Amino acid sequence: MSGHSKWATTKHKKAALDAKRGKLFAKLIKNVEVAARTGGGDPDGNPTLYDAIQKARKNSVPQDNIERARKRGAGEEAGGADWQTIMYEGYGPNGVAVLVECLTDNRNRAAGEVRTAMTRNGGSMADAGSVAYLFNRKGVVLLPKNGLSEDDVLSAVLEAGAEEINDLGESYEILTEPSDLVDVRKALQAEGIEYDSAETNFLASVNVPLDADGARKLFKLIDVLEDCDDVQNVFANFDVSDEVLEEVNA
């Protein structure tokens, strides 16, 4: 679990600095638009929209882009697309289970992109339900340490519903039930504790340990999937040790 989380944290730091930044912006803007359409355009009354806007800001998406996406979703401005959330399931190299979350206005295009990415990079598609049972939906909050101890964080969020705190090296990861995510985020804010993101993700209940070769193959598949315009998130049930992660990143 910790190896997977450290990899994801490192990957997203790099994504903010390289050519994938444009794709990341597009995904974050899409999240804002969909959140506004689903729960209304007022962030104070729509926690999902609030968190989508905060995440976009943290990743340096221009405020004007964020506001236009909010207005499109809320129907205050023309041009909003009919986005659909679709989950695809499959297997990656070494039998790793893969969940691909798409947000698309063209179901056939999304399915084709995901299938091509999987089959060309050592993966295969699976029937609905084949791997989804290996994952649980959880609220996940990431926050920089900023001199905070694990006890500092725990005392701030325990009564709000935090289930687990993981030390990821430079940051902490707080896990909650999805229904407690907003309360945990608000508890951090009440204590003046800065956080990087608060969102729901699919976390694996069982992980497949990978060596460096297996990790490289899987990371390539995930990178190709995430490069697809319709793909918002990719979840996989793998774990890598710190040593393997260092070898892969060397």
UniProtKB/Swiss-Prot annotation:
User: What is the annotated localization of this protein?
Assistant: Cytoplasm
Taxonomically, which superkingdom?
Bacteria
Keywords, sorted A to Z: Cytoplasm, DNA-binding, Transcription, Transcription regulation
Q: Which Pfam families does this chain map to?
A: TACO1_YebC_N (PF20772), Transcrip_reg (PF01709)
- Does this entry carry the keyword Cytoplasm? yes
What GO biological process terms does the UniProt entry carry, in alphabetical order?
regulation of DNA-templated transcription
SUPFAM superfamilies reported for this sequence? YebC-like (SSF75625)
According to the UniProt entry, its GO molecular function terms are: DNA binding
> Can you supply one Gene Ontology CC term for this chain's record?
cytosol
Which NCBIfam families would you find in this protein's record? PRK00110.1, PRK12378.1, YebC/PmpR family DNA-binding transcriptional regulator
Family the UniProt entry places it in? Belongs to the TACO1 family.
Kindly provide the name given to this protein in its UniProt entry.
Probable transcriptional regulatory protein SACE_2018
Taxonomic source organism: Saccharopolyspora erythraea (strain ATCC 11635 / DSM 40517 / JCM 4748 / NBRC 13426 / NCIMB 8594 / NRRL 2338)
Highest lineage ranks of the organism? Bacteria, Bacillati, Actinomycetota, Actinomycetes, Pseudonocardiales
